[in-house]
Amino acid sequence: MAVRKIGLAATGIAMLVPLLWLPGIVAGRDMLAMFSQYLGMTALIAMALSQTIATRWPSIEQIFGPLDQSYRLHKWLGLWALAASFLHDTIDADMRGLGRETLLVGAAETAGEISLYGLLILVAITVATFIPYHLWKWTHRFIGVFFVLSAFHYLFILKPFSNGDPLGLYVGLVCLIGLVAYGYTSAPRWLRPSRDYNVTKLEREGEALAVHLAPVGRPLKHRAGQFVFINFPDIGMGEPHPFTLSAAPQEDGRLRMSIAPLGDYTVRLMRRLTEATAARVEGPFGDFKIARGPQVWVAAGIGITPFAAMAGALGPEDGPVTLIYSVRERAIAAHLAELEAVAERLPNLRLVVRETSRQGRLDADAVAAITGDLKGVHVLYCGPAPLRDALGVGLRKHGLSPRRFHYELFEIRTGIGMKRLLEYLTKTTGPLRDRLEKASPL
C-alpha cells in the first residue's frame, strides 16, 4: 500500500502554484528575498494540507491513499513545513518600499517567530519516539495553534503583493481550508461523524480479548481487513484508538475487534471494558483486502486480526490462500479454532501454524519452504515491523516482487529513521575510530 499518485501530484501542484504569479512580482526586487517569500508560502501550504489529512475525512483516502500512508505524508508535510519555515526565517525576506510598519505588522512578525520555534519543539517531540505516546498526543494538538499563528503572520506581514491579488487569494484560500480542518479536528468528538455501539460480549482468545459490539442505530459498513478508530468515553478511554476489525462484515452490522496487551492503553482498556460499555466508532479506514489470484497471508501474534476477518469473507472463487500464523505457542493463538474451522470448510484456504517456541522464529526461508515458488503470488503481512522489514528483504531473494508485498503501517506516530542513521554511523565510525587509534602515536 502506498500514497496515491494523485495525492502526491496534488501536493506537488499545490506547492508549485505560487510560481505562476511570482515572475510578475519578481521584477526589480531582491531574488533571494522572493525565494524566502516562496518558502514561507510552501510552509503554509504544507501545514494546511497536513491539517486536512488529520481530519480523516472520507475523501482523504480517495485522494491520498489508505490512512496509514496518508499519515506518513502528513508527517513529511510537517517536516517540510518546519524546514521551509526555518529557511524562510534564515533568509532575509524583507524588501524595501513595501509600506510602513505598524503595530499589526509587528504582531505578525512576532507570531511568525513563535510559530517557528513552536513547530521546532513539537516536531522534535514527534520524531523522538522515546517520549511517551500520551505526552506526544497532548502536545501534538498545539501544531494547529502554530498554524493559526503562521496564517496570521502571512495575512498581515508586509509582502510584495496584496491579499486581494490572485497569489494572495490562493494562499489565503489554502490557509482557510487548513483553518477549517483544524477547527474540525478541535471540535467536540460528538460533532464528528461516528456510529454508536455497545459491547455485547467479551471473549478470551489466548492472550487477546475479543470484543463484540452491536450497533445502536445505523450500523457501520466495512470490508474485511479494514480498521476503525474507536473510543469508550464512559470508562475514561475517550481518545480514539485504531483497531482492526477481526470479523467479516455481518448483515446486522455487528463488529468484533481483538485486543492484545501490547501497551499501556490496551492493558487499561482490557481491564476496564465490560458488557454494555458504550463505544463510538469512526471509519472504516484502510485498503488491506483480499488480493486476486494466489496469495500468502503472514500473521504474527495479534496481526492475525485482519486475516481472521478476511478468512471469514473468503469465497470459493478467491485464492488459493496459504495463511501462515506465527505464534509463540498454539495455546495463546487468538481465533485459531475459528480459522481451523474455515480452513476445513474451504479447500482454497490452507492454514499453517508456526509455533516459534518449538520451531524457531519465522523468516523468509521458512515462508518460502511452506509456500514454494513465490513468483506471481501476493504476500499480505500483518505483525511487528522488524519481522515485516526482514520478510520484505528476504522474500525478494525467493522471487517475490516488492509490489506484491502488502502491509499497512499502524505506527500512527513514527520517527524519521533516526535509529537506522545511528546504526549506520556506529558501523561507520567504529572501524574508523579503531584505525585512527592504531595510527596515532602513543
Predicted regions and their residues:
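Membrane-anchoring hydrophobic segments
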Residues: 1-87
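FNR/FR-type flavoprotein reductase catalytic core
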Residues: 5-15, 60, 73-93, 98-187, ...
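Membrane-interface capping segments at transmembrane-helix boundaries
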Residues: 25-26, 185-195
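Intrinsically disordered, low-complexity segments enriched in polar/charged residues with Gly/Pro
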Residues: 31-33, 38, 50, 54-57, ...
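Ferredoxin-reductase
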Residues: 190-277, 322, 327-329, 340, ...
